[in-house]
Amino acid sequence: MTQEYSTLRNNISMLGRFLGETINDAQGEDILELIENIRKLSRNSRAGDDKARQALLDTLGSISNENIIPVARAFSQFLNLTNIAEQYQTISREHSLAQSSSQSLSELFKRLKEQNASVEEVHKTVEKLLIELVLTAHPTETTRRSLIHKHIEINKCLSKLEHHDLTEKERNIIERLLLRLIAEAWHTNEIRTVRPTPFDEAKWGFAMLENSLWQAVPEFLRQLNETAREFLGYDLSVGLKPVRISSWMGGDRDGNPFVTAQITKKVLYFARWKAADLFLQDISKLADELSMMKCSDEFRDKYGEHLEPYRFVVKNLRNQLTATLAYFDDHLSNRTPRVSESEIILEDNQLWEPLYDCYQSLIQCGMRIIANGSLLNILHRISCFGVTLSQMDIRQESTRHTDAIAEITRYIGLGDYSQWMEDDKQAFLIRELSSRRPLIPQNWTPSPETKEILDTCKVIAQQKQGVIACYVISMARSASDVLAVHLLLKESGVPYHIPVVPLFETLEDLDAAEKVMTQLFNVGWYRGVINNRQMVMIGYSDSAKDAGMMAASWAQYRAQEALVNLTEKLGIELTLFHGRGGTIGRGGAPAHAALLSQPPRSLKNGLRVTEQGEMIRFKLGLPAVAVETFDLYASAILEANLLPPPEPKPEWRTIMDELSTISCDIYRGVVRGDKDFVPYFRSATPEQELSKLPLGSRPAKRNPNGGVESLRAIPWIFAWMQNRLMLPAWLGAGAAIRQVIEQGKGDIIHKMCENWPFFSTRIGMLEMVFSKSDTWLSQQYDQRLVKKELWYLGENLRKQLEDDIQTVLSLSHQSELMSDLPWIADSIALRNIYTDPLNLLQVELLHRFRENPEQVNPDVEQALMITITGIAAGMRNTG
């Protein structure tokens, strides 16, 4: 690693040394020597020593069941410690001094000034800025909450050690604490013994809000204001809401039978309880601070004459929040509430108005510095979190709504709605939506499945407007899918409009998105209720699983572009909701590059994007890291709107159409067309064993008896990442590029790389995937776990991977992958030394596991789970 990363190198070395001491104390010298020998063999193997490679295979294959767990844990925990050190590096003083990121807000405003950008235009764009992060429960978040807490404490220790004026005694105290935390982690079982419930997942999300985002959001808003003020010459408005937090935890029931209406209600109560708790802590501290006696005449007229007027107001709020806490505590405990709704805080304005009055009075009385202290932080939190802490999305699969309405129409003698033509469905739905009479008879008893759908809608009806952000329909394919949800909400007594969001996921659905939305917008009733605002969700995971990365990316781009043009023509404000994941196969890319590769004008109403599991932890898990993430998002959105990327040239579109068709044919030819593919996939990856790992509450398959098509996109990608073939993220892409170049269109491809962010980002993503892949390791899975007659498939795929790597290198004019980002290349090289043994151990363990699946040794099963989580840590992503 380069000189500027000396602290990172030193931190990794120190953490590794402390882990070694811990292992020595816990397991003894023999185990430590074995681990150290494996590490050296792995390092030499990576350096090209064939003898070391064979010795590594022999050593790992001969480890007893008894010793295999500590060996797996050692490499897994080292990779977790490396992740901690790298996460800290991004916010360290050394990193800040060494790099002035061209992607930061401050650098963007410098460029805007150099280009004489209009102050008025910049101000208008900043005031419209919206970053809405939707936190989702990730079924492959492999790290337990108990360990995450220890990892946060380790990060804090690294921060303290960066102070150069520490005495030797102070340094020793911090290092002893580090050693203790590493020992605590070693003696903690990293594998959950039980699968988390949806409520557990929601509590995990709220813990992240409390421990990181609660501090990060006000800090980011201050940073945004200071940076903008240098350009504008004045402050942004206090009520600015550039960050909004929403959540699928407790609301996403697509394919998860454990998320019920009762769970949704419980999570909503818990969110309000947690919000009251956090605001109560803030308000109690504020009561100590606001001891000033002077206030404005308007403030005195409104709140009366008091010796300490601000404390009077704040203490009243404290009493209301205390009552609010008790009210929701009673609901969560299934007790009759001790206080009435009239005594508690249910609306944001009940908090905002009195505190904003305090803020204005303090400024009018010459106490701006006090107003801009803790009070301003609380106002920012009210703006961004509100008294519900986050808004909730409800998500359900489209056929569940179709089945519910079909059950109703059959009962009332209208026939089977699910069998009707689309025009007939729409006519029926519009007629019922326009009718004042109820559709559902009072004496009707629905099936349990339909009752659950209706109960969920009734829970929505019980909430105040704004608590539920939207209702997302997965696998949306028609206008009737959207109208059906509106009808179910109406029949359940929802008294206000809720945005209903179609999620277009497959290649065919993305291509049809414009047509579906045009049909919807042509419905008079629908145009009347949406108030010229529409949200559409773009699915990245399932489209990539359906058609491969290249075809899916282009379909996503074209769908967004078409929707932007359609809504602009109709005068409708469009918000695009991006269902991205952390991996390339799920739309993942560095945030700044990903946003600037979107179609022009697609971010003018802000960004709404899912943040999942381990990516929440990596990008938002520490306050300083979260501030940097918000800064990158804000910079990219503002740049996309103020300095938009170029429209793709007609010849670029033609090339992308060709690449899409060729790559999709290649991808589907393997995944769908080869009869041996499914048995090969099941043998060559730990896909079957993944279901045994109690990671998330949601089952890995929509249909437990189905094949690859029924497998969720996340475990599909997770399985291929484990065996280092990384197939979903590249299959078809490189081969398609190669074919187009061979047709004599290489010059156009090179121009696309140089001048079109969309295409250059795709190539950069491929390069990252290739850097993490490994054909030799993939071959070890095949030779040990796959029947010989299926080996040809792996050999063909690895040959294609090697050819694709050469194709991408030729485009970037480089001899080695990631040579333009040396610190990332170095990081991957370091991780490989520790991840390789885990991969080889996993091969050995899968072999032992499958030899006698009815009587698996518990140590083998436990060690296998550890290799899965360790490889996930080494790859820095799961699914």
UniProtKB/Swiss-Prot annotation:
GO cellular component assignments: cytosol
Alphabetical list of InterPro entries matching this protein: PEP_COase, PEP_COase_bac/pln-type, PEP_COase_Lys_AS, PEPCASE_His_AS, Pyrv/PenolPyrv_kinase-like_dom
Cofactors that this protein relies on: Mg(2+)
Reaction equations catalysed: oxaloacetate + phosphate = phosphoenolpyruvate + hydrogencarbonate
Broad class of enzyme this protein falls into: lyase
Residues annotated as catalytic: 138, 545
Single GO biological process annotation from the record: tricarboxylic acid cycle
Cited SUPFAM superfamilies: Phosphoenolpyruvate/pyruvate domain
Keyword Magnesium belongs to the record: yes
Pfam family name, one: PEPcase
Keyword annotations from UniProtKB, A to Z: Carbon dioxide fixation, Lyase, Magnesium
MF terms (GO), sorted A to Z: magnesium ion binding; phosphoenolpyruvate carboxylase activity
EC number of the protein: 4.1.1.31
Family statement: Belongs to the PEPCase type 1 family.
PANTHER family: PHOSPHOENOLPYRUVATE CARBOXYLASE
Function: Forms oxaloacetate, a four-carbon dicarboxylic acid source for the tricarboxylic acid cycle.
Name of the protein this chain belongs to: Phosphoenolpyruvate carboxylase
